[in-house]
Amino acid sequence: MVRSLLPLSWRRCASDSSNSSTNDDIIVDYDGPDLPLPEYPNRPNEPLGMRKQRLLYQSRKRGMLENDLLLSTFAHKYLKDFDEDETAIYDELINGVSNDWDIYYWATGVKPTPPQYETDIMELLKQHVKNTEKVARFRQPELTYYL
C-alpha cells in the first residue's frame, strides 16, 4: 500500500491495471502552474567544521560534471578560509538554488545573477571560473577534511 505524504492540492489516481485489485500503484499529478519545491533546511546548530565538510562533499556531487568541477575546485581552494558568514552564504548559494544550471550560467556570466545571490562569494566564484591562472581542471581535487 502506498501512503501519500503530498499536499491535498495534488491529485492522486490509481493505475488502471486490470490485474491488480488494490491501489498499490499511484500516479501523482500536480495541478498547479509551478511544481512547489521544498525549502532547504536551515541547520542553525551545525558546527562550522561539519558544515564545511558537508559543503565540500556537496560541491563535488552536483549532478552535472561542469558544476562538479567548478564547485569542487572552488571549495577546495577557498572554503577552508571562509568564516561562518561566508560559509552560510556559500551554503545558501549551492543548496538554496533549485537548478544547478542556474549556478553554472550565473558563474560563467551567461545569465545575470539575481540580486539575492550577488554576493562576494558569487564574485569570487565568477573570478574562479575565469581561471586567469590557466589551471587545468579535468578532475576533482582529493577530499580534504577541515575538522
Curated annotation (Swiss-Prot):
Entry's transmembrane regions: none
Subunit annotation: Interacts with the flavoprotein subunit within the SDH catalytic dimer.
GO cellular component term of the entry, any: mitochondrial matrix
Swiss-Prot/TrEMBL keywords: Chaperone, Mitochondrion
Miscellaneous comment text of the record: This protein may be expected to contain an N-terminal transit peptide but none has been predicted.
Cross-referenced Pfam families: Sdh5 (PF03937)
GO BP of this protein: copper ion homeostasis; mitochondrial electron transport, succinate to ubiquinone; mitochondrial respiratory chain complex II assembly; protein-FAD linkage; tricarboxylic acid cycle
InterPro entries linked to this entry: SDH (IPR005631), SDH_sf (IPR036714), SDHAF2 (IPR028882)
Database matches in Gene3D superfamilies: Flavinator of succinate dehydrogenase
Major subcellular location class: mitochondrion
Name of this protein: Succinate dehydrogenase assembly factor 2, mitochondrial
Family: Belongs to the SDHAF2 family.
Localisation: Mitochondrion matrix
Organism in which the protein naturally occurs: Drosophila grimshawi (Hawaiian fruit fly)
Biological role: Plays an essential role in the assembly of succinate dehydrogenase (SDH), an enzyme complex (also referred to as respiratory complex II) that is a component of both the tricarboxylic acid (TCA) cycle and the mitochondrial electron transport chain, and which couples the oxidation of succinate to fumarate with the reduction of ubiquinone (coenzyme Q) to ubiquinol. Required for flavinylation (covalent attachment of FAD) of the flavoprotein subunit of the SDH catalytic dimer.
HAMAP family named among the record's database cross-references: SDHAF2
